[in-house]
Swiss-Prot record:
Residues 382-466 form the KH-like domain. Coiled coil: none annotated. The gene is der. The lineage of its organism: Bacteria, Pseudomonadati, Pseudomonadota, Gammaproteobacteria, Enterobacterales. This is GTPase Der. It comes from Yersinia pseudotuberculosis serotype IB (strain PB1/+). PANTHER family: GTPASE DER. Belongs to the TRAFAC class TrmE-Era-EngA-EngB-Septin-like GTPase superfamily. EngA (Der) GTPase family. It comes from the Bacteria. Associates with the 50S ribosomal subunit. PROSITE patterns: G_ENGA (PS51712). GTP 1 binds at residues 9-16, 56-60, 118-121. GTPase that plays an essential role in the late steps of ribosome biogenesis.
Length: 495
């Protein structure tokens, strides 16, 4: 399961700056659920291929004596729920009493904790971080979050336990090294699409992990019970009756599924127990662990900012998506028309997802959900050959030529599959990384229509070959050398 990293520390030590650096955002609003918990932000991050969920816990302004009360509630739960804690301190301000109080609490927890000294830019990091070793949390990692210095190395150290062990290097004989060298030279000299590797993976042999997510009391557990045909999940007419994600295996139409019923994302005003306040982490982890996400929306409450924030996290994770508008029964035709107009207005950016209008309580429309779930999963795991992708790319280029970049036409060479769930198309060419966003969207939509992909986002990646002449100066011919010599002589006489 994707690890969770919590950023803790005093106010103004740079937690939000590091959060923005890791999530590649400016305003720290990635997967932010307004009003859920004060000053808490959630984001999905990827650094050097390492994926994780990062949580900004807000400032903890505690003292050595009163840290337990200051860290109660949300901040305390954030530390308990996280897999890794980054305890951030201010290298310029030095060691403060609040830092000592927070460190004392962290030492009492069996949690992987890394001490991070921020704001070390422009100063000697060794001198600035010396006092922090007295906190008893081991090595001090010096970074400058505003400039990104030391951040990549920090994440590599933090994520080391979650990385696959590297395979030991195998020593080659002189004959094997010679053969490998010439094979590499031959491969570099050819500019041809790679052959499609043989893949014995059959996605139909694996159960489909279906995460049922949404705000509290939209009917997620009722829908789960309706699908299973039994009261497997405790249901009450009040938000927050499902506290932890529940994994339930099932079979439908000879197809194996694993249903993931998640704790809902709720507003701060409806929270009555502290244990309910951090269930959003369970939801985000369930999304990452799933193949298809079923987002349940309450037709009578409409689409809230929390729904859109959750939808944004689903899209960022690349998971397949099916939308269920629940509590459709009993609504007038006029009210239904208003809901459909609202869906068209606010969900236009996810036009690839199927939308179903259901009643989990009475079962109407529930049976059709699995057709869309199966379709979305099949589309996200469908294997497509290099020749077909290249042909689609060429047709897109013929219908609408790439724009000029610095006076030269962008050249698209070939395309191949780069991954699945979500489908990734890798396009090779010259200057492809300089393509405008509008043309990239055009290519993405063209591939979606041509491949008839529904229920899953599709991603386009661009790669361009190295220019063998980059950074090299052309040698002058003898004639050019003589002309240069005469010119330099003329310039000297002019002085």
């Amino acid at each position: 399961m994707i690890p969770v990293i919590a950023l803790v520390g005093r106010p103004n030590v740079g937690k939000s700056t590091l959060f923005n650096r890791l999530t590649h955002t400016r305003d720290a609003l990635v997967a932010d659920f307004p009003g859920l918990t004060r000053d808490r932000k959630y984001g999905r991050a990827e650094v050097e291929g390492h994926e994780f969920i990062v949580v900004d816990t807000g400032g903890i302004d505690g003292t050595e004596d009163g840290v337990e009360t200051k860290m109660a509630g949300q901040s305390l739960l954030a530390i308990e729920e996280a897999d890794i804690v980054l305890f951030m301190v201010d290298a310029r301000a030095g060691l403060m009493p609040a830092d000592q109080g927070i460190a004392q609490h962290l030492r009492s927890r069996e949690k992987a904790t890394f001490l991070v000294a921020n704001k070390t830019d422009g100063i000697d990091p060794d001198t600035a971080t010396a006092d922090f070793y007295s906190l008893g949390l081991g090595e001090v990692h010096a970074i400058a979050a505003s400039h990104g210095r030391g951040v990549t190395q920090l994440i590599e150290d933090v994520m080391a336990p979650y990385m696959d062990a590297e395979e030991p290097e195998v020593e080659l004989t002189d004959e094997e090294e010679n053969a490998a060298y010439w094979a590499e030279q031959e491969a570099q000299g050819e500019d041809v699409p790679p052959e499609d590797p043989e893949d014995d993976f059959d996605p139909r042999t694996l159960p489909i992990k279906l995460a049922i997510v949404g705000r509290p009391n939209v009917g997620k557990s009722t829908l789960t019970n309706r699908i299973l045909g039994e009261d497997r999940v405790v249901v009450y007419d009040m938000p927050g009756t499902t506290r932890d994600s529940i994994y339930i295996p099932m079979t439908r139409d000879d197809r194996e599924y694993i249903l993931i019923d998640t704790a809902g994302v709720r507003k701060r005003g409806k929270i009555t127990e502290t244990v309910e306040k951090f269930s959003v982490i369970k939801t985000l982890q369930a999304i990452e662990d799933s193949n298809v996400v079923l987002l349940v929306i309450d037709a009578r409450d409409g689409i809230s900012d929390q729904d859109l924030s959750l939808l944004g996290f689903i899209l960022n994770s690349g998971r397949s998506l099916v939308i269920a508008v629940n509590k459709w029964d009993g609504m007038t035709e006029e009210a239904r028309a208003q809901v459909k107009d609202m869906l068209d207005l606010r969900l236009g950016f996810v036009d690839f997802a199927r939308i179903h209008f259901i009643s989990a309580l009475h079962g109407s429309g529930v049976g059709n959900l699995f057709e869309s779930v199966q379709e979305a999963y099949d589309c996200s795991t469908k294997r497509v050959g290099t020749s077909l992708l290249t042909r689609i790319m060429q047709m897109a280029e013929e219908d609408h030529q790439p724009p000029l970049v610095r006076g030269r036409r962008v050249k698209l060479k070939y395309a191949h599959a780069g991954g699945y769930n979500p489908p990734i198309v890798v396009i090779h060419g010259n200057q492809v990384t300089d393509l405008s966003d509008s043309y990239k969207r055009y290519l993405m939509n063209y591939f979606r229509r041509s491949l008839k992909v529904m229920g899953t986002p599709i991603r386009i990646q661009f790669k361009e070959g190295e220019n063998p002449f980059a950074g090299k100066r052309n040698p002058l011919t003898p004639n050019q050398m003589r002309k240069r010599k005469r010119l330099m002589s003329h310039l000297k006489k002019g002085k």
